[in-house]
Regions:
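Conserved glycine-rich acetyl-CoA-binding loop
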Residues: 65, 88-102, 109-111, 122-129, ...
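A generic secondary-structure micro-motif detector
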Residues: 36-37, 94, 117
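Acetyl-CoA-dependent GNAT
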Residues: 4-89, 98-103, 107, 140-146, ...
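C-terminal "cap" of GNAT-fold acetyltransferases
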Residues: 114-134, 141-160
């Protein structure tokens, strides 16, 4: 079951983001010092700010527990940015990420978007393959001097 997040649930959502992004941070050697903007280290104030500015946030539940989270941010008339797609390690490989992704495409399309963009750690080949297998197209890369990895940019059409 996927549904919109309420403000009171943001601390629970942050725990999901921290745990899910934490496995990737560990794998790629990310720390609060070398990558403070990574979801593994995000403060509640940032998530609350995004919520209050109107970003759409959703959770995927199994029973009473939150298994996954995602955030959609409008970036233009026809474009949304998919952010913080996160599935707790114990719920991975059960289709929750794919369900959240499909829901994101439908939600963005219902709000007039034609495309969804995402930025990932380019060196995370497993994640990149997953997005490509789920309809995304690799659009290029960029090196940012403040990040210890290359950012890969992907995009997909909404609604499908």
């Amino acid at each position: 079951m996927i549904r919109r997040v309420t403000e009171s649930e943001l601390p629970l959502c942050l725990r999901v983001i921290h745990e899910a992004f934490g496995t990737v941070a560990e794998e790629f050697g990310l720390t609060p010092d070398n990558c403070p903007t990574n979801g593994a280290f995000m403060p509640l104030t940032r998530l609350l700010e995004d919520y209050r500015k109107g970003d759409a946030m959703f959770v995927c539940r199994e029973g009473g527990a939150i298994a996954g989270f995602m955030q959609l941010s409008r970036r233009g008339q026809a474009v949304y940015e998919l952010e913080k797609l996160a599935v707790l390690p114990e719920y991975r490989h059960r289709g929750y990420g794919k369900a959240l992704l499909g829901f994101a495409k439908q939600e963005a399309a219902a709000n007039g978007a034609a495309r969804i963009h995402i930025g990932i750690i380019e060196e995370n080949e497993r994640l990149k393959r997953w997005y490509l297998a789920n309809g995304f197209v690799h659009m290029g890369t960029r090196v940012f001097s403040h990040l210890p990895f290359t950012v890969g940019f992907l995009e997909t059409a909404c609604g499908g």
